């Protein structure tokens, strides 16, 4: 920032007068004249970013004088000095910039009207008035039924907006010139709003409600009024711009997947179970006879087949389902019940909107799948209709589409935010530097003692400013009312002595850290006089620290500092001593934990006694916390007490607790009890991770201020738009979506419900509400609105939220904790306790030794221990004086302490002892932190790595540890002779066996076989006796093999090595389970419950594969490293959720019960059944039940389950409906009676779900980055082999540039080669591919035969065209065709297309397999993928995916392993549960395939609520324990609720929260890497482009072009290598080598243009080596070329020649003049002494040389000039006249080239160039010279 420092003070502000305008016009004229003279424009300046319109005036300018405020002033930005602008500065020092042109062509800037308008416009009250108007207007817009007088109010609003626009137009002008009304895009919004208001008022445009929606844009006006919002909207727009590539790729991928879906599943979702055969036998006979005779039914027949199958009464419906049951005709599809057959009939599911019948609906289905909204429904419908095999399609779409592309959007938004953040920080740093330079300048101006004081003040303030940049946002800093940091010295002082001594005064002045001295009265007066110059410039810095009004100090001294008398001060000291003791802190923490436990023990139903105990407990805890607050107030004084954040927090909670006790019996205020829960947050004081989480949320919410406002505006706008557009439709067409014609829960008829729908869309749930909307209001408008909310709100703004959250994580904050070297009081107390226990142990040990008569030899240590204990206790007493602040504000008080110790060196040495003791304590007890916060160990090699790095031992190690051998001498064996030698030989043999590769391979094979065997033990095993017997024997064999393996390893490795390896332990435990199970079977105890449950643990067998497969092992190692951090966050999340769970119990316990009709499962209305007793009375006469919602808030455990369902948005609707309908305990719920309970769920979703679940992504990414840096930046998810693949992929990315394909010598081939090499040909083929894609999109399920025929013919044409293209390329490119990857791809696609065309006929005729037919048709979609070839951005993203593949494969393996294990568990435990909710004949745990399908669904957290519900059935009447399962002895269809909840929760945490987030972490990292590579100035595409352009200039592939064509070639390149014409000078200066024949080599040109882009950097050197190496590799046989000259050298030679010519021509001119003079004197007979000889000799010599050595035009001209007769009386022309005279002379060279025209000037300068240029008198000499050069 090399800008000159602007002048300080107010002298820069000058009124804008007519003279100022004249001066601007003069400067503009001067600038244009200068440009004309110099012939080139000046470097464009940029306006100062500090002086932009809308920003505050920088403090360096000071405050403008009052009379210059709100007055037009001359522009202070140098950039605008030559532009017609002026500025006005408002009272808040905000800059406004206006055009000085007359507004509307008539109102000059000096007009009273315009000045008045400007004053109104910039006044803060005007902005406030407009803001209030907009907010009021927004309130009126939310009214669904506005009152009659609202029309008048509407006119008022329109009038106000018109007035605002008029003021703006009068003050700024309308649209001509800068800074006018329409030049600001935000004003377009105003213009549109006002125009629409008048248009709708005066022109009848029909649909009024639709036009009223335009009014909602007024809400966007808030963005124009609030300054910070414009910035954040700018950032959003930037992120959207950056998302274009990802968006294109996403849409392209969606289109491809939609086409695949269209081909595979077209029409499948209409296959329903139809009642068949028809009961009426006659109709059936008619139908049957017609079918047999192969004729269709006659229209006159009575039986209407179409009407029959479309009649819903003939279709099979499941209980409670809105759509008929789907089915399929393939073997693994859904089956129909008896009496029904599968036919295509009726409409598609979900009002007909879920289908693949045409491209549009298929695209919507795939978008829904990609955004994972209710995709389990689509998954279940498709698999039921098409078959389970098609799960593969969903796996690909979920992993590629949902996990990869959706997270790419997150990556792009995060990147855009980071860039924005970087730019902001850079700007702040620049300002800081400029400010510091200014301070230096100001300091230099000051002299004497005043100057020194001033500089001290400046430094102090400057340091404050620097600190503010790196503020840690800690709430724990102790500040006084001025906002200044209060030193400990003052906080802890309780004596009445308030004056500093002179010595202390001096010390405090000498310390730069103490900031108190400037506030002392005498000093501040002197300083003020010294700083009078700086007052204006420094004022901005004091904003944050403005002192309180003087009255407050008196008030504080009198009432807030309790220092009344000596006894009170003594009492206060004692209270301080007790309250600040670490043990009191420990006690309070224990009370907080106990209080939390007491609150968590509330449940329904509770016995009165238990309720009483909890009530008393609450009173006790409230008393304890109140007492703590009171004592702290006494100890610290209110003045200092309320300067600690935690104390304020405590006081608020205590006050609320006391208020709640007082209002305990008031109805409706029970919610106050919830505030007690906030005490849990007090744990954050002593729990760093919780503290850190709260800080992250705090920082994010702080940073999100503006973004939250933008999101609120978006939500508001869309809620109002929805209400205005669709509200009436919901009311009028409600019967379409509701059986009882009542409004459903989700509608847009009023603002609140409309807001809830928009919020639900932001949560990612949009499809179900959109179906309702489309049904009542039409598809098109609903699609547009819902998609806009989804894309803008969810994908952009919410991802920006997440990006902010991720950016809140810094390096080690989750694992390192608060490593500030100080411990909190809790740690000190625990340290004391442990030391006390150690001391007691030592005491007991010494007493025992004395009793036994041994003399203790540790007297010295004991003495030292006493000293240490004394020192530590003494230290603790010292710390008590520090109080609570010691652990709250360590980072800010350390420097102060250091300064004090510097000046107080002569104090008692006791303090230094304390310091030493303190240091010892901190070092020794750092482990206390590690129990809470995992700290990664120093980078030591892990066991596996050690094995890899060090040579493995050739012989077995010792069996036992040295300790064992010392204690048991018999374990020591001599291995040199006897039994010992035999034992040693046996061990060596075993060692050789287990180390052999064959043994390891065999064991892996056995593990895979035994795991595979488990998959067969499904529900059908009892019916397959043979398989069951085989599996039983196999199980025994596997067990024996694994036991033998374990014994071999014991003998080979020894117990020491075996049992110190974690993987061996895993093997040992799994073998033990098999062993116990086998033993129990042999003894006949296999039916025991314990043994049965133990048998399920066999599912862990596949875990043994972990250590054998390196790919999985590296992922598990990385995961194990992350477990402490993940566990930490999980614990913090559980604490966070505990608050919401307890609150839920307080609000909803026992209130979810309701009375239902057991036959219809519907709730009985409240007017029939009011409460539980009414229901019980009905129970004896009717089929009714008083039931609870299965997932509820009756206790904290169930509350947690409810919150997990809400956080994953699965099953949350039922919970929310129950909450909103709830009344009181034992009362029948009523529809939406408790409407605002929705807010509980909204708040939890924001804080509990959004923040905490996304925290997992943050912690995983953060932890893996740490591990990566620990291992030196290596990828921790890849094996060594995979790293080789990764590097190979990287090399492929930077592949060598192919050698240009030589043009064939054959004429016809050459013509074809030229044709296919043209860009037009590529564009033509791309257009055809797009058209082909369009024709595929046109296909529909119910298309006519004609349409099908036409599409078939079109497809035929495309196949012919693409085949022709392939043949042409093969013909022209010869063998080189297959050297290009894309050509091979095209070739394969063409072959497949032809094969598909031929096979489709054969399949249709001979094999009726529609599935196979469809799969073959997919080959056509391959053509679409060719489009990728043309898109650089998309290739980058796909390359990032290719780079991610090895790591993703490893994670996929781990995920499959987890799914495998859990599916075996599921088969063991949940195979026989009742089929209801999410469990049916396809989705269940009966077989391994079904289990895998269910678990794949849950991997994305989808549908787990439906699978859990049947498992929660624990007994009658929900399920039947005696239910007989056919084909097996197992009875009952009840679930196991405890096991089910554990199973699903653990799987969701492991897969959805951990493994899937690892997947996301890898994608983000690889995307960043790919972006960094593509963000390089040059990439491989640029070099490819260079080659393509080169081929056009060097058709014969000689690798050379002529020097004259160089300039055209470089101009023909694309950015960034292109150098546009005129480029002659630039290229000449590049010093490019030229070889014989005036030719230049391609490599030299490439190096030159590359250097131009990269500059002389290290990258350039590397690039040069790479290019040269590749060239040598590509052209091993090419002849070497030696440059004879370079472009720059040639130019220098030309210049030298011209210089010589110029000198010589001057000499000739002088000669000619002398000759003329000689001739004249001769005629006049006047002789000169020197005129002995005529001066023509040189001319004669030159003429002779010209004759001998060829024609030289310059010389010829000179000679001609020399011999041309001159008039005797002619005067030599003036230089200016000669300059304006031009002549164009062209002379032929001997080689036949044209030479340059000669330009005649006063110096007779003759220049040459390779082109002929005709000069005319109007052209500027300088311009022509430059163009020639």
UniProtKB/Swiss-Prot annotation:
Glycans are attached at residues 207, 280, 293, 329, 1157, 1171. Residues 1-124, 172-185, 227-245, 412-582, 633-646, 687-702, 802-998, 1049-1062, 1109-1125, 1258-1320, 1369-1380, 1429-1447, 1564-1829 are cytoplasmic. I repeats lie at residues 106-421. Keywords: Cell membrane, Disulfide bond, Glycoprotein, Ion channel, Ion transport, Membrane, Repeat, Sodium, Sodium channel, Sodium transport, Transmembrane, Transmembrane helix, Transport, Voltage-gated channel. Residues 902-916, 939-957 have a biased composition (Acidic residues). Residues 144-150, 204-209, 266-358, 384-390, 602-612, 667-668, 722-750, 772-782, 1017-1029, 1082-1089, 1146-1196, 1219-1235, 1339-1349, 1399-1411, 1466-1487, 1511-1540 are extracellular. It catalyses: Na(+)(in) = Na(+)(out). Expressed in skeletal muscle, brain, spinal cord, and eye. Residues 1276-1278 are annotated as: Important for rapid channel inactivation. Belongs to the sodium channel (TC 1.A.1.10) family. Nav1.4/SCN4A subfamily. Pore-forming subunit of a voltage-gated sodium (Nav) channel that directly mediates the depolarizing phase of action potentials in excitable membranes. Navs, also called VGSCs (voltage-gated sodium channels) or VDSCs (voltage-dependent sodium channels), operate by switching between closed and open conformations depending on the voltage difference across the membrane. In the open conformation they allow Na(+) ions to selectively pass through the pore, along their electrochemical gradient. This is Sodium channel protein type 4 subunit alpha A. The gene is scn4aa.
């Amino acid at each position: 920032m090399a800008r000159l420092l602007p002048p300080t003070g107010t002298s820069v502000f000058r009124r804008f007068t007519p003279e100022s305008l004249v001066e601007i016009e003069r400067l503009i004229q001067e600038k244009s004249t200068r440009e004309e003279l110099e012939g080139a424009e000046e470097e464009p300046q940029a306006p100062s970013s500090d002086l932009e319109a809308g920003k505050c005036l920088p403090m360096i300018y000071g405050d403008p004088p009052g009379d210059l405020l709100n007055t037009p002033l001359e522009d202070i930005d140098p950039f605008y000095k030559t532009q017609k602008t002026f500025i006005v500065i408002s009272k808040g020092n905000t800059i406004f910039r206006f055009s000085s042109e007359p507004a509307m062509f008539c109102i000059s800037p000096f007009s009273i009207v315009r000045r008045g308008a400007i004053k109104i416009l910039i006044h803060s009250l005007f902005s406030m008035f407009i803001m209030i108007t907009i907010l009021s207007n927004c309130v009126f817009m939310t009214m669904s039924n506005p009152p009659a007088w609202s029309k008048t109010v509407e006119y008022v609003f329109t009038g106000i907006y018109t007035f605002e626009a008029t003021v703006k137009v009068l003050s700024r002008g309308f649209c001509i010139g800068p800074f006018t009304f329409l030049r600001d895009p935000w004003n377009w919004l105003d213009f549109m709003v006002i125009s629409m208001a008048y248009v709708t008022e005066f022109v009848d445009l029909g649909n009024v409600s639709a036009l009223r929606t335009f009014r909602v844009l007024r809400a966007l006006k808030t963005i124009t009024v609030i300054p910070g919002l414009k910035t954040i909207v700018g950032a959003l727009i930037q992120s959207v711009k950056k998302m274009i590539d990802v968006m294109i790729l996403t849409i392209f991928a969606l289109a491809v997947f939609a086409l695949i879906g269209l081909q595979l599943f077209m029409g499948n979702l209409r296959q329903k179970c139809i009642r068949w055969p028809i009961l009426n036998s006659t109709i059936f006979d008619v139908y049957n006879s017609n079918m047999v005779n192969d004729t269709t039914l006659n229209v006159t027949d009575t039986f209407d087949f179409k009407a029959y199958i479309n009649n819903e009464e003939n279709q099979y419906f499941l209980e409670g389902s809105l759509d008929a049951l789907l089915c399929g005709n393939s073997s693994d599809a859904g089956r129909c019940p008896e009496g029904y057959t599968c036919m295509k009939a009726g409409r598609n599911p979900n009002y007909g909107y879920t289908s693949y019948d045409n491209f549009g609906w298929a695209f919507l289905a795939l978008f829904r799948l990609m955004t994972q909204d209710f995709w389990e429904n689509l998954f279940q419908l498709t698999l039921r209709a098409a078959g389970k095999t098609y799960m593969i399609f969903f796996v690909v779409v979920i992993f590629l589409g949902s996990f990869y592309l959706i997270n790419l959007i997150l990556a792009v938004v995060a990147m855009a935010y980071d860039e924005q953040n970087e730019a902001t920080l850079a700007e702040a740093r620049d300002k800081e530097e400029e400010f510091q330079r200014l301070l230096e300048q100001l300091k230099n101006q000051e002299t004497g003692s005043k100057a020194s004081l001033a500089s001290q003040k400046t430094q102090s303030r400057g340091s404050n400013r620097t600190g503010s940049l790196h503020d840690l946002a800690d709430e724990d800093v102790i500040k006084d009312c001025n906002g200044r940091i209060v030193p400990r010295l003052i906080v802890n002082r309780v004596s009445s002595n308030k004056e500093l001594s002179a010595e202390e005064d001096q010390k405090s002045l000498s310390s730069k850290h103490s900031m108190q001295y400037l506030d002392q009265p005498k000093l501040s007066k002197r300083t003020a006089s010294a700083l009078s110059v700086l007052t204006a410039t420094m004022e901005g810095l004091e904003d944050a620290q403005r002192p309180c009004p003087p009255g407050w100090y008196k008030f504080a001294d009198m009432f807030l500092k309790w220092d009344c008398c000596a006894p009170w001060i003594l009492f206060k000291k004692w209270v301080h001593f007790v309250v600040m003791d670490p043990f009191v802190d420990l006690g309070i923490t224990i009370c907080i934990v106990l209080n939390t436990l007491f609150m968590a023990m509330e449940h329904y139903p509770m016995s009165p006694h238990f309720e009483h105990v909890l009530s008393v407990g609450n009173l006790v805890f409230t008393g304890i916390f109140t007492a703590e607050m009171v004592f702290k107030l006494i100890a610290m004084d209110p003045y200092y007490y309320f300067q600690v954040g935690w104390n304020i927090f405590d006081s608020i909670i205590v006050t609320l607790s006391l208020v709640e006790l007082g209002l305990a019996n008031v109805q409706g205020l029970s919610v106050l009890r919830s505030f007690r829960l906030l005490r849990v947050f007090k744990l954050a004081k002593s729990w760093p991770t919780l503290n850190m989480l709260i800080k992250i949320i705090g920082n994010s919410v702080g940073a999100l201020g503006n973004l939250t406002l933008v999101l609120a505006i978006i939500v508001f706008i869309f809620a109002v738009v929805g209400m205005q557009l669709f509200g009436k439709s919901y009311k009028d067409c409600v019967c379409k979506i509701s059986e009882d014609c009542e409004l459903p829960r989700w509608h847009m008829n009023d603002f609140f419900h409309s807001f809830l729908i928009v919020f639900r869309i932001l949560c990612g749930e949009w499809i179900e509400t959109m179906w309702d909307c489309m049904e009542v209001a039409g598809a098109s408008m609903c699609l547009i609105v819902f998609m806009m909310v989804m894309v803008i709100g969810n994908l952009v703004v919410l991802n920006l939220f997440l990006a902010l959250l991720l950016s809140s994580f810094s390096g080690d904050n989750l694992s390192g904790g608060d490593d500030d070297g100080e411990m909190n009081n809790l740690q000190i107390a625990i340290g004391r306790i442990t030391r006390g226990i150690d001391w007691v142990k030592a005491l007991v040990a010494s007493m025992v030794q004395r009793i036994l008569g041994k003399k203790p030899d540790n007297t010295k240590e004991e003495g030292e221990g006493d000293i240490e204990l004394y020192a530590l206790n003494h230290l603790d007493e010292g710390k008590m004086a520090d109080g609570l602040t010691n652990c709250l504000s360590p980072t800010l008080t350390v420097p102060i302490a250091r300064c004090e110790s510097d000046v107080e060196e002569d104090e008692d040495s006791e303090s230094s002892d304390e310091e030493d003791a303190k240091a010892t304590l901190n070092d020794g007890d750092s482990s206390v932190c590690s129990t809470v916060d995992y700290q990664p160990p120093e980078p030591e090699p892990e066991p596996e790595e050690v094995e890899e790095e060090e040579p493995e031992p050739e012989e077995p190690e010792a069996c036992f540890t040295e300790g064992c051998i010392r204690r048991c001498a018999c374990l020591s064996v001599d291995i040199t002779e006897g039994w010992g030698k035999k034992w040693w030989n046996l061990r060596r043999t075993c060692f050789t066996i287990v180390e052999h590769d064959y043994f390891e391979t065999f064991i892996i094979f056995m593990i895979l076989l035994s795991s595979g065997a488990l998959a067969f033990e499904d529900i059908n095993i009892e019916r397959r006796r043979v398989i069951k017997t085989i599996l039983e024997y196999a199980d025994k064999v596997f067990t024996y093999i694994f036991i033998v393996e374990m014994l071999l390893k014991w003998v080979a490795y020894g117990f020491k090595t075996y049992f110190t390896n974690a993987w061996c332990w895993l093997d040992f435990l799994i073998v033990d389970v098999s062993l116990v199970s086998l033993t129990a079977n042999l003894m006949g105890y296999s039916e025991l419950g314990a043994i049965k449950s133990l048998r399920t643990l066999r599912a862990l067998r596949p875990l043994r594969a972990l250590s054998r497969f390196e790919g999985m092992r590296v992922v598990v190692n990385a995961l194990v490293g992350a477990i402490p951090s993940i566990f930490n966050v999980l614990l913090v999340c559980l604490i966070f959720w505990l608050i919401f769970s307890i609150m839920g119990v307080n609000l909803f316990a026992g209130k979810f019960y309701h009375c239902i009709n057991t036959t219809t499962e519907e709730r009985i209305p409240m007017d029939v059944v009011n409460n539980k007793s009414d229901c019980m009375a009905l129970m004896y006469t009717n089929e009714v039940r008083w039931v609870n919602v299965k997932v509820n808030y009756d206790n904290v455990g169930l509350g947690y389950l409810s919150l997990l369902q809400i956080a994953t948005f699965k099953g949350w609707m039922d919970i929310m409906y129950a909450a909103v309908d709830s009344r009181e305990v034992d009362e029948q719920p009523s529809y939406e009676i408790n409407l605002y309970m929705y807010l509980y769920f909204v708040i939890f979703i924001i804080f509990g779900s959004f923040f905490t679940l996304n925290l997992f992504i943050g912690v995983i990414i953060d932890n893996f980055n740490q591990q990566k840096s620990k291992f030196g930046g290596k990828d921790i998810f890849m094996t060594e082999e995979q790293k080789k693949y990764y590097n190979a992929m990287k090399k492929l990315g930077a592949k060598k540039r192919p050698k240009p394909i030589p043009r064939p010598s054959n004429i016809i081939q050459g013509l074809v080669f030229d044709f296919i090499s043209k860009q037009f040909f590529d564009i033509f083929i791309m257009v055809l591919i797009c058209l082909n894609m369009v024709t595929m999109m046109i296909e529909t399920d119910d298309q006519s035969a004609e349409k099908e025929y036409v599409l078939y013919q079109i497809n035929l044409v495309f196949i012919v065209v693409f085949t022709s293209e392939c043949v042409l390329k093969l013909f022209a490119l010869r063998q080189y065709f297959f050297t290009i990857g894309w050509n091979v791809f095209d070739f394969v696609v063409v072959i497949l297309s032809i094969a598909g065309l031929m096979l489709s006929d054969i399949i249709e005729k001979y094999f009726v397999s529609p599935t196979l037919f469809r799969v073959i048709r997919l080959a056509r979609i391959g053509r679409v993928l060719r489009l990728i070839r043309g898109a650089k951005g998309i290739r980058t993203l796909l390359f990032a995916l290719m780079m991610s593949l090895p790591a993703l494969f490893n994670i996929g393996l781990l995920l499959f392993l987890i799914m495998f294990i859990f599916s075996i568990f599921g088969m063991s435990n949940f195979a026989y549960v009742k089929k209801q909710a999410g469990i049916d004949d396809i989705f269940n745990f009966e077989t391994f395939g079904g289990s895998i399908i269910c678990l794949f669904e849950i991997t994305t957290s989808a549908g787990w609520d439906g699978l859990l519900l049947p498992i929660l059935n624990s007994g009658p009447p929900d399920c039947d324990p005696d239910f007989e399962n056919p084909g097996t002895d197992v009875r009952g269809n009840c679930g196991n609720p405890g096991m089910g909840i554990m199973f699903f929760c653990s799987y969701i945490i492991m897969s959805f929260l951990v493994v899937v987030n690892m997947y996301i972490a890898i994608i983000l990292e690889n995307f960043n890497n790919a972006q960094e590579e593509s963000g390089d100035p040059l990439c491989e595409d640029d070099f490819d482009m260079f080659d393509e352009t080169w081929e056009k200039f060097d058709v014969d592939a000689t690798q050379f072009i002529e020097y004259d064509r160089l300039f055209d070639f470089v101009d023909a390149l694309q950015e960034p290598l292109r150098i546009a014409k005129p480029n002659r000078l630039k290229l000449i200066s590049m010093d490019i080598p030229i070889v014989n024949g005036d030719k230049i080599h391609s490599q030299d040109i490439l190096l030159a243009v590359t250097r131009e882009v990269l500059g002389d950097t290290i990258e350039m050197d590397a690039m040069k080596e790479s290019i040269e190496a590749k060239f040598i590799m590509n052209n091993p046989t090419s002849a070497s070329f030696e440059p004879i000259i370079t472009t720059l050298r040639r130019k220098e030679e030309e210049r030298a020649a011209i210089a010589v010519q110029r000198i010589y021509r001057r000499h000739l001119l002088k000669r000619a003049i002398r000759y003329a003079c000689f001739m004249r004197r001769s005629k006049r007979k006047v002789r000169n002494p020197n005129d002995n000889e005529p001066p023509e000799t040189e001319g004669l010599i030159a003429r002779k040389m010209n004759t001998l050595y060829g024609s030289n035009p310059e010389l010829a001209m000179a000679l001609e000039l020399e011999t041309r007769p001159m008039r005797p009386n002619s005067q030599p022309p003036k230089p200016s006249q000669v300059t304006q005279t031009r002549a164009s002379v062209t002379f032929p060279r001997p080689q036949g080239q044209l030479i340059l025209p000669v330009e005649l000037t006063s110096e007779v300068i003759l220049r040459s160039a390779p082109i002929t240029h005709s000069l005319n008198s109007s052209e500027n000499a300088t311009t022509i010279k430059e163009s020639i050069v």
